């Protein structure tokens, strides 16, 4: 079977979505299929041009390549899932959230645009085309709930393992830090962690890994750390290799991941594979599908004081952090996540 995986690429931005597409491609090839990725350029920073990019996707014809039929299109992201195909399956990583739950959220460009309302309505109308697919899957229950709530579209949650799942481990000796690996953006809430650090009673230290959405945002976070007086307890690792990331997981006391209504979040699963407790928030979305409060981690209210209390607790009670981490690893094993099951469902 010849399969195209349709997604988008924001130039100079790479993260979980790109790993997701590559993982799916590898799984399809391993199952004996011919598969490739078509990544459509997408620039959400210019809201007025988003309808043009939607139209460009709608006009693409991927039904055949060099005279050979494409048997199936598996579409992952907005606006690539608008590409028409008679045998299309959509596995929604996320919609354009600025038109939905992140409307009016700080640092989102759409609501601040003079034509923002018009573009938002165009996006919402276009998303109704999801119903044309032969099947709609969601990357998590959280995404499935959003699709139902905002679009009235039913979808099936379909989990998958993170990249290189078999490579994660837990070190015998932990370091003196919590680990927070993530793209730096307002929705990931690195700023909340900095504010919590300023309120901790213990000398908690945090290592942040990942690049900022923009150089300006990265500078803003560092200025905030200085303003709060916590810069000596923060380490900015920036880009890290996969090996460096796994090593940081392995030696961490625990993992912090408190995003705003996250879609899925490899970070939670990678922490569980590394036998690390996860500290997250009540409104963090995807992580809550895997983190059980007082069993595999701590779930706090989304404010600095509550998060600081959780940081202090696991910083002081290392045995408890290790216990939660072991339980997280057991929970991951019980879920039985596999790419072979993903392929089976997408091609059914």
How would you label these PLM feature ranges?
Residues 170-188, 194-201, 206-207:
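Conserved donor-binding/catalytic core segment of Leloir-type glycosyltransferases
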Residues 293-305, 313-318:
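Conserved acidic donor-binding segment of nucleotide-sugar-dependent glycosyltransferases
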Residues 260:
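Aromatic "clamp/platform" in nucleotide-sugar-dependent glycosyltransferases that forms part
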Residues 216-218, 231-241, 248:
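Active-site donor-binding acidic/aromatic loop of nucleotide-activated sugar
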Residues 205-222, 238:
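Glycosyltransferase donor-sugar binding loop
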Residues 108, 112-136, 144-145:
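Membrane-proximal helix-turn-helix segments that form the acceptor-binding/catalytic region
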Residues 306, 313, 320-335, 341:
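A short, well-ordered alpha-helix in the C-terminal region of glycosyltransferases
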Residues 277-281, 291:
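Short hydrophobic beta-strand element within catalytic cores of glycosyltransferases
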